[in-house]
């Protein structure tokens, strides 16, 4: 089974992304015609999820470059074209600072462009086409990587949890949105849930609402319902009671990641750290699922990760459709105040879960666990790194 949801629609020169701010009530696609469009779609959270952010950023610039090529507006000079692309990449990298996938993609793309430019016979158009091909390959590779993550993670949970060994079907708790809407397709943590469901090994999935942006309630619940996966939505503050009630009947808490430090400390959606503490207390496995591009070997620990802070209004207001539409039956979206005027607000978008609270980190290459001294060795994941062809 493959998820029917398609959040990114791309063909060369054309990019559409689903507007996640309107989900689950309205399904509408936004055309992305330039790097500037891509930057705004990421910054304003029309698209979110670390893998999807990187892909949309690259494809937005690919669309822009395709237009310049077709209009014959590309400089004939390879170096000029490389500089133009790199300036656009640096601009796109400022849209969301915490998610490492974007900065990692920018770094790798710059390396590819530099190597390509060294070819004396290379033209500006060839540099542009090389970039476009690289961006397109990212889209293809991400889907394949997600399916591998789903399989590796599901198999590890089945083999390493009491309910996995003893029962034929498992219950999983997840946080935020890590599915088709957060990636090129299938998902990371939600990909594990999908794989268990495909193999008839999933009893039930639980998803948190994920305040303040409600990605769990709006997006993960939307995906679970769409794929007919048995699931229940809970508020963030109910997770402790769920674990107290069900104990190790919850096989694992599975989350994604926006940045993983070299020691395994993981930055993810706010509330992840709380779930990890709860998992430790209740003896439930805590699993991080992310592609290798999310692992930042240049960041030593979680203390070095910059945490993005979002607008106060995301906490003090909530947006949704009226229960009844207008006189013609059309959906009417409204922004509602839910907090006292004048109250101070702190709104970090992410928190950092220490590696000590994480049982396993799942990537497309397999499952990483800690050694006898309680340390992850994530560097081994990059010993045979394969980049998308250009």
UniProtKB/Swiss-Prot annotation:
Q: What function is annotated for this protein?
A: Catalyzes the interconversion of methylthioribose-1-phosphate (MTR-1-P) into methylthioribulose-1-phosphate (MTRu-1-P).
Q: What is its EC number?
A: 5.3.1.23
Q: Name one GO cellular component term.
A: nucleus
- Catalysed transformations (reactions): 5-(methylsulfanyl)-alpha-D-ribose 1-phosphate = 5-(methylsulfanyl)-D-ribulose 1-phosphate
Which residues are listed under the site Transition state stabilizer? 176
Broad class of where this protein is predominantly found? cytoplasm
| Entry keyword annotation includes NAD | no
The record's listing under InterPro entries reads: IF-2B-related (IPR000649), IF-M1Pi (IPR005251), IF_2B-like_C (IPR042529), Initiation_fac_2B_a/b/d (IPR011559), M1Pi_N (IPR027363), NagB/RpiA_transferase-like (IPR037171)
Where along the chain is the active site annotated?
258 (proton donor)
The places in or outside the cell where this protein is found are: Cytoplasm; Nucleus
Listed GO biological process terms: L-methionine salvage from methylthioadenosine
Q: What is this protein called?
A: Methylthioribose-1-phosphate isomerase
Similarity comment: Belongs to the eIF-2B alpha/beta/delta subunits family. MtnA subfamily.
Keyword set, alphabetical order: Amino-acid biosynthesis, Cytoplasm, Isomerase, Methionine biosynthesis, Nucleus
Q: Which domain of life is it from?
A: Eukaryota
Supply one GO molecular-function term: S-methyl-5-thioribose-1-phosphate isomerase activity
User: Which pathway or pathways does this protein act in?
Assistant: Amino-acid biosynthesis; L-methionine biosynthesis via salvage pathway; L-methionine from S-methyl-5-thio-alpha-D-ribose 1-phosphate: step 1/6
């Amino acid at each position: 089974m493959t998820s029917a949801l398609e959040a990114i629609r791309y063909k060369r020169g054309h990019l559409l992304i689903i507007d996640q701010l309107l989900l689950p009530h309205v399904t509408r696609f936004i055309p992305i015609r330039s790097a500037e469009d891509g930057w705004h779609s990421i910054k304003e959270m029309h698209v979110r999820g670390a893998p999807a952010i990187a892909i949309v950023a690259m494809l937005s610039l690919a669309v822009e470059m395709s237009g310049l090529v077709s209009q014959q507006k590309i400089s004939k000079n390879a170096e000029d074209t490389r500089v133009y692309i790199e300036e656009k990449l640096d601009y796109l990298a400022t849209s969301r600072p915490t998610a490492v996938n974007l900065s990692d993609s920018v770094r790798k793309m710059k390396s590819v462009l530099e190597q390509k430019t060294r070819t004396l016979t290379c033209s500006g158009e060839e540099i542009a086409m090389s970039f476009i091909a690289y961006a397109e390959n990212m889209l293809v590779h991400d889907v394949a990587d997600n399916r591998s993550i789903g399989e590796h993670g599901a198999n590890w949970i089945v083999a390493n949890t009491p309910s996995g060994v003893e029962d034929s079907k498992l219950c999983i708790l997840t946080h935020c949105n890590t599915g088709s809407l957060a990636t090129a397709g299938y998902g990371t943590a939600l990909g594990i849930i999908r794989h268990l469901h495909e193999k008839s090994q999933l009893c039930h999935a639980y998803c948190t609402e994920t305040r303040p942006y409600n990605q769990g309630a709006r997006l993960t619940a939307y995906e679970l319902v769409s794929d007919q996966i048995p699931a229940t939505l809970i508020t963030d503050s109910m997770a402790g009671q769920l674990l107290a009630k069900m104990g190790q009947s919850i096989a694992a808490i599975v989350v994604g990641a926006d940045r993983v430090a070299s020691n395994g400390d993981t930055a993810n959606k706010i509330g992840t750290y709380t779930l990890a503490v709860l998992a430790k207390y209740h003896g439930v496995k805590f699993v991080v699922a992310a592609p290798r591009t999310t692992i930042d070997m240049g960041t030593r620990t979680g203390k070095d990760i910059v945490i993005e802070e979002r607008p106060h209004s995301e906490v003090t207001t909530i947006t949704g459709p009226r229960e009844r539409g207008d006189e013609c039956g059309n959906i009417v979206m409204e922004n509602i105040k839910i907090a006292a005027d004048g109250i101070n607000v702190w709104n970090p978008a992410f928190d950092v879960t220490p590696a000590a609270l994480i049982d396993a980190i799942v990537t497309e290459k397999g499952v990483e666990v800690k050694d006898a001294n309680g340390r992850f060795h994530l560097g081994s994941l990059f010993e045979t790194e394969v980049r998308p062809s250009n």
